[in-house]
Amino acid sequence: MITIEQVLEVLKKDHNFRDIINQEHYHYSWTGVTFDHLSYDSRDITPSTLFFAKGAGFKLEFLESAVQAGLGFYVAEKDYQVGIPAILVSDIKQAMSLVAQAFYQHPQDKLKLLAFTGTKGKTTASYFAFNILKQSHKPAMLSTMNTTLDGKTFFKSNLTTPESLDLFRMMAEAVSNGMTHLIMEVSSQAYLTKRVYGLTFDVGVFLNISPDHIGPIEHPTFEDYFYHKRLLLKNSQAVIVNSGMNHFDFVAEEVADKDHDFYGKDSENTVKHSSGFSFKAKGKLAGDYDIQLIGDFNQDNAMAAGLACLRLGASLEDIKKGIAQTSVPGRMEILTQANGAKVFVDYAHNGDSLDKLLQVVTDHQKGKISLILGAPGNKGESRRQDFGHVLNTYPEINVILSTDDPNKEDPLTICQEIASHINRKVRIIIDREEAIKTAMSETTGSSDALVIAGKGADAFQIVNGKRTDYAGDIEVAKKYL
């Protein structure tokens, strides 16, 4: 619960309060109202709800339907003149975050908070951290793929970083479940849209950076993307940074006055020797480690998670056990066909992660290698050219372009755009299951491999803004083993 006096105090302290308008009368204060529910969904309303009118696509009819359902107060950046008092603010997203924190009694102060950002690897690193911390603590986790608020039951996530009203509600639930730590993925969009406004993390980890999420509805430029990624570092008590990342010198200078650890090449904390399923680390994590996820980049993610968890109370023994136990749905999942050929299913969905994935596969498989790939519609349009550039460095790979969350675009047009950046002939099979079936029928022996990239564990296709039925890459591949 929260009183209107408390709401106004929060907004005024943040210099975000403008005024309350009611029937053309202006008010600086208001008393005698208590809210027991916060919402930004006009279909989720009670008379004691405080409603937030947010988003570029917000429509007057949404608010009108909420008023009909009994709504008595709303927060907005303008007066919609619907006959009830409006609390006007300069920034609705900032207001949502701070009011939610107060409403849920600041649950972030009752948890140790660990956040990962980066173009790729956030989910894998989060899973490493979850498995490390659960050895001796009680972690909750919010990841792109799955969320757990009790450390035991998992449910599918809708956003990499939830909207602030949902985020602090979930934090409060984690606290009530007795959780001690919370692991989060924090996207650049989370800072762009202020979902984590006012939140300070105990440890923030910057895994890597490469051009992605640049387009009309995301970041206008790489500089904007990079800046919003770095906001995690500004809002963390201690930071962990990959010394092998692009623009590391800049980031290292930026965090020089913070409590920090660097990991990766040319740093104290690095992998000294690695093989497929084990590695030896030096530095703060010195020792021998077993790992289920092959690839140097996964070992780097494990190092990042280990260093972060070391700061949050994990022992070296916890770190070793947690890394050894970690597997991630849709990340480097490997199936073996009857003829011995390997099928790799991975979420790699941008140029950099695709390149890393293909490096691992080509290191291990020396026969014919095929790749099934697509690109999502209406977002991350720069990926299509990036995919082409990467695939031009692997001329021996047989490429089949297919559907991957086309949304409101034509999947054929998306595939043709990717193909236009590839300097050899490729096939287009729009039906993703048919593409997988075809590619698996073309393998001949144990040295061959099929890589199915982009969707990972997603058991849906996004078409015209809605999730449509799709069994998922791993399940489809299992059908044709």
Swiss-Prot record:
UDP-N-acetyl-alpha-D-muramoyl-L-alanyl-D-glutamate binds at S42, N158, T160, T161, S187, R195. Carboxylation is probably crucial for Mg(2+) binding and, consequently, for the gamma-phosphate positioning of ATP. SUPFAM superfamilies: MurD-like peptide ligases, catalytic domain, MurD-like peptide ligases, peptide-binding domain, MurE/MurF N-terminal domain. Pathway: Cell wall biogenesis; peptidoglycan biosynthesis. Pfam families: Mur_ligase_C, Mur_ligase_M. Gene3D superfamilies: Mur ligase, C-terminal domain, Mur-like, catalytic domain, MurE/MurF, N-terminal domain. One of its GO terms (molecular function) is ATP binding. GO terms for cellular component: cytoplasm. Transmembrane segments: none annotated. Keywords: ATP-binding, Cell cycle, Cell division, Cell shape, Cell wall biogenesis/degradation, Cytoplasm, Ligase, Nucleotide-binding, Peptidoglycan synthesis. GO terms for biological process: cell division; cell wall organization; peptidoglycan biosynthetic process; regulation of cell shape. It comes from the Bacteria. It is an enzyme of class 6 (ligase). Its main location: cytoplasm. A motif (L-lysine recognition motif) lies at residues 404-407. The modification N6-carboxylysine is found at K229. Its EC number is 6.3.2.7. It is found in: Cytoplasm. ATP binds at G118, T119, K120, G121, K122, T123, T124. It catalyses: UDP-N-acetyl-alpha-D-muramoyl-L-alanyl-D-glutamate + L-lysine + ATP = UDP-N-acetyl-alpha-D-muramoyl-L-alanyl-gamma-D-glutamyl-L-lysine + ADP + phosphate + H(+). PANTHER family: MUR LIGASE FAMILY MEMBER, UDP-N-ACETYLMURAMOYL-L-ALANYL-D-GLUTAMATE--2,6-DIAMINOPIMELATE LIGASE MURE HOMOLOG, CHLOROPLASTIC. Catalyzes the addition of L-lysine to the nucleotide precursor UDP-N-acetylmuramoyl-L-alanyl-D-glutamate (UMAG) in the biosynthesis of bacterial cell-wall peptidoglycan. Belongs to the MurCDEF family. MurE subfamily. This is UDP-N-acetylmuramoyl-L-alanyl-D-glutamate--L-lysine ligase. It comes from Streptococcus thermophilus (strain ATCC BAA-250 / LMG 18311).
